[in-house]
Amino acid sequence: MLSLILTIFFVHVAIYLVNTVGATTIDTLLWILYLKLPTSTSRNARQQSRLKREVVQLKREMNNTSSQDEFAKWAKLRRKHDKAMDEYEAMNKKLTAQKTSFDWSVKIARWLSTNGLKIFLQFYYSKTPVFALPAGWFPFYVEWVLSFPRAPRGSVSVQVWNSVCATAIAVMAEIVTSMLLQLRSRSASPASTAKAQKAQ
């Protein structure tokens, strides 16, 4: 079983990743993966894309056919196009409803596994110390703040540890990002200098 310290840390890593990558990006990726599974929804998606190609093809043929010179052929293509368009729109509505339902399910699961778990841990372990502080190292008021609101004095509470983890992860991410940007600018700098020297 994972210790409380690491559990809270990994929950905050997950929250940070979801906030950084973006919930809609994750939802879209999960929808694409879901459509790869052998389900009725994936069959509907394949049928919808087939109907879309058919509608585009029929529209192209209609545009290439003169409505005055070849009216019978144009009218036949128009009827096929209208029928395919109606089927496409019906399938699109059905698929949109399924995607909306899927998105709600994913949002609920994502919230429960990140923020919901964080809130649960804060309430369930509110009186449990995350770890104990060495006796006599800190003054009374520092021990009181670190154990706020309900952990025993002389320990670190779940709420304080949550704040520490969230802040540490955000700061480390900023440091890593700035280092990567610095390295990228240094590696791009010699290449641009070499191009400038060749131009002279």
UniProtKB/Swiss-Prot annotation:
The chain crosses the membrane at residues 5-24, 111-131, 156-172. GO terms for biological process: tail-anchored membrane protein insertion into ER membrane. Residues 25-110, 173-200 are cytoplasmic. Residues 1-4, 132-155 are lumenal. Pfam families: CHD5. It is a multi-pass membrane protein. Keywords: Coiled coil, Endoplasmic reticulum, Membrane, Transmembrane, Transmembrane helix, Transport. Required for the post-translational delivery of tail-anchored (TA) proteins to the endoplasmic reticulum. Acts as a membrane receptor for soluble get3, which recognizes and selectively binds the transmembrane domain of TA proteins in the cytosol. This is Protein get1. The lineage of its organism: Eukaryota, Fungi, Dikarya, Ascomycota, Pezizomycotina.
